[in-house]
Each structure stands twice: as C-alpha cells, then as structure tokens.
C-alpha cells in the first residue's frame, strides 16, 4: 500500500502563464519534501495548463487535471479540496511565491500545537515584476491562549488583509470551508470559521510573498469582476448582508460555544460589521427573510 505524504499542496489555476512557474518552483524548492501537489486548471485559455503539465512530467509529486467547463474560483478550489487525503493541506496561489522554509516551519508549529487548525506564513507584498517590499500583507489574527469567543471577536475586529487564508490547514477542517457560498469576502468567513475549530497561528518570520495587483479599479468595476468570476451573487440589499448572515449561522451551528457566548459574539459582530462594512441591521434582516422565503422559489 502506497504511503501518503504529510501535506497536499493545492493549486487552482486559471490563465496564470506568467507566474505559474515561479509559484511551482518555490514549492518544489522547499526544505520540507514530504508533500504532493495537485493542480486543477479551470479551462485556461493561455498556456497555463501546458506549463503545469510539463512540471508534472518532470516531478512525480505533481498531478494535473483540467475542468471540462470553467467553474469559477470557488468551485475550482472546492474540486481541489475533494482530492485531499493527507493530514495537512496548503492552498498555493499561482501568482505568489513561498520561502524555502515555509512548509517546514508551519508543519513544525502544527506538530507542537495540537489545537492549531491553521498556521499561516507571515507575508509581505511584492510587485507583479517581483520587487519585494517591506509592507506587511498580514492581519493581527493569531489566537493563541484565547478562548473560542475571544478568538472570533479578534478575527472579526482585526482581519483586513486575508493572506492568512493561504496557510497550512489540518485537512479535517476543509469540509467546513464554505466554498459553496457566493458572497463577498469569503476569505474572511473562512478564517472566521477556522477560528471556531481551533487556533490560528503564524510563523515568526516572513515566508510568503504576495503579488499585489496594481489595478486601478472603481468599486463598481471590482463588483462587476466578482460577479463575472462567480465570486459574488448580486442582491438588492447590502453586498455584505449575506456575509454577515453566514457569520451568524457559523456561530449558531458551533458545538463548542455556549448559548450565552453565541449571543455575545453575534451582538458584537453586529456592531463590528456594521461599522466595517456599512451594513445595516435592516439589510441583514431583509436579506435573511428574502433568502428564507423568496429565494427557494426563484
């Protein structure tokens, strides 16, 4: 019987021909080598699939498959998560680069912290041509020594940059990532959900380099792109109403939080998200009623 490695690296690919080689090289050059890479190409129209396939021919740790139709980012990530049968999982963005000690350091932290559900590499931004900056791409969301209620409040208050979502997870958590939710800021919801199930920890040094797309987009253009990529389903209410509702649902479903603490967290979230995302309680209630009563019949 073939022994499975400790870590699966998942890469969701779509038209990344200019950066995919750098991303894969950075993964293959890790000091920690007990991993495999699975690549799901979402119907790229450039040479991304061919480049990935060439890598797979040279290294038997890599497997590549191609979707028959374009699924969109969330569905493609979900396809990747279905193929994980190792203790740990890492989402490798096809645009970014990881330091050679990234896997080693994160796995070491996991192994010495049984309650950790996610260990993310500290990150800085770099330009699209590879110029590394000193600007942090992180948020203060390390939750060591916090109870679950305080973890959730810290996540909701402090999360702005979501690079931490590209960390190493315990694979048992993947079933909880709500990739079927076409809402704004799903990465924030994913981190919030992780904090329900365990600690979020970080490496002590910068081990992740996140490419910063310097795109001059208006909010309307960004929203249009999210709709086109099937990241977000338009609604007549605040774009963040469903986002808030899904946070409430995650809290209410959690089995490790008392009723008293659930109510305290939901009350706090209403205030935090109302300020951060300018979403009113009225929009939250109306969106919930719409989804409950009207949406099933559309």
Map each language-model feature to its residues.
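Nucleotide-sugar donor-binding/catalytic module of glycosyltransferases
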Residues: 2-223
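A solvent-exposed, charged loop/short amphipathic helix patch at secondary-structure junctions
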Residues: 220-232
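Membrane-interface aromatic/basic loop that binds lipid-linked glycans or pyrophosphate carriers
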Residues: 231, 235, 241, 245, ...
């Amino acid at each position: 019987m073939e022994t499975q490695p400790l870590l699966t690296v998942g890469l969701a690919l779509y038209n990344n021909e200019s950066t995919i080689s750098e991303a894969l090289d950075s993964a293959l050059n890790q000091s920690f080598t007990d991993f495999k890479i699975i690549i799901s190409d979402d119907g790229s129209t450039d040479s991304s699939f061919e480049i990935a396939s060439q890598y797979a021919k040279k290294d038997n740790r890599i497997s590549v498959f191609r979707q028959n139709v374009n699924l969109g980012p969330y569905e493609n990530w979900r396809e990747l998560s279905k193929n994980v049968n190792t203790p740990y999982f890492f989402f490798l963005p096809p645009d970014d680069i990881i330091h050679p000690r990234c896997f080693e350091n994160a796995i070491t932290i996991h192994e010495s912290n049984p309650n950790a559900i996610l260990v993310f590499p500290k990150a800085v931004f770099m330009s699209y041509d590879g110029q590394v900056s000193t600007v942090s791409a992180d948020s203060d969301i390390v939750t060591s020594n916090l109870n679950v209620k305080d973890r959730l409040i810290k996540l909701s208050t402090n999360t702005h940059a979501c690079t931490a979502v590209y960390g190493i997870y315990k694979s048992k958590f993947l079933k909880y990532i709500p990739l079927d939710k076409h809402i704004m800021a799903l990465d924030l919801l994913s981190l919030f959900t992780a904090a329900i199930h365990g600690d979020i920890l970080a490496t002590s040094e910068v081990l992740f380099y996140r490419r910063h797309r310097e795109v001059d987009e208006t909010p309307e253009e960004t929203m249009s792109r999210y709709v086109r990529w099937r990241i977000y389903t338009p609604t007549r209410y605040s774009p963040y109403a469903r986002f808030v509702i899904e946070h409430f649902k995650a809290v209410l479903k959690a089995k490790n939080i008392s009723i008293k603490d659930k109510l305290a967290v939901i009350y706090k979230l209403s205030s935090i998200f109302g300020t951060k995302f300018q979403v009113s309680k009225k929009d939250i209630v109306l969106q919930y009623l719409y989804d409950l009563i009207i949406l099933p019949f559309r």
